[in-house]
Amino acid sequence: GGVYECFSADAKEFDAYKYRITRRDGSSVLKSDPYGYHMCTRPENATKVYTLPDFDWTDREYLKKSAGKNVIEEPINIYEVHIGSWQKYEDGNYLSYRAFADRIVKYVRDMHYTHIELLPVSEYPFDPSWGYQVTGYYAPSSRYGTPEDFMYLVNKCHEAGIGVIMDWVGAHFPKDENGLYEFDGSCCYESSDPVMNEHPDWNTRIFDYSRNEVKSFLISNVVYWLKKYHV
């Protein structure tokens, strides 16, 4: 246990890094930073040194107007969409956040939707999971671009009067070695009770909501997305 700190004068923006965790039995494991802002693109899974940009948001009027609405009485029409499967480039590659933004806004407005609901965008390793097996809770998936690119997407939607809802996975997480799973060799984010920590349908671990540290991690993550990305 305890709080640890490390400073590297040689670290540069976009450098990849992991934490080497030494377990009680003497073995070690390499872990991605649970609070990392940007991740390497799969199949790589290291965290990148990254400074969140001072993005030039132009959605102030939308946010002000949205805050004054009665969400119960106002009409709402939500378009749920997965960035990776909605459209692709001709070569089969995923659209970037920016390319997706430029296309989705016109479509949503033409179809008279008020909001888009994005399937999970937090970093995840397995494409067919559609984002529901998160390993980087603070990092928009790098398969579509940078955190700044995701800010562009949200801002573009808000400029057009379109709200952005983000599907958020706060129930369980996968057993990928670099992720939250048995982070220090013991159950840090999940319960140590084998009956309570296993999701039988997904073969994933369930968050232990009885721990204040876990609650803080998840609540802080929600606030982070609201404040930094305006979702």
Residue ranges and their predicted role:
Residues 40, 64-73, 82-230:
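Substrate-binding/active-site clefts of carbohydrate-active enzymes
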Residues 3-80, 85-92, 99:
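The feature marks proteins involved in alpha-glucan
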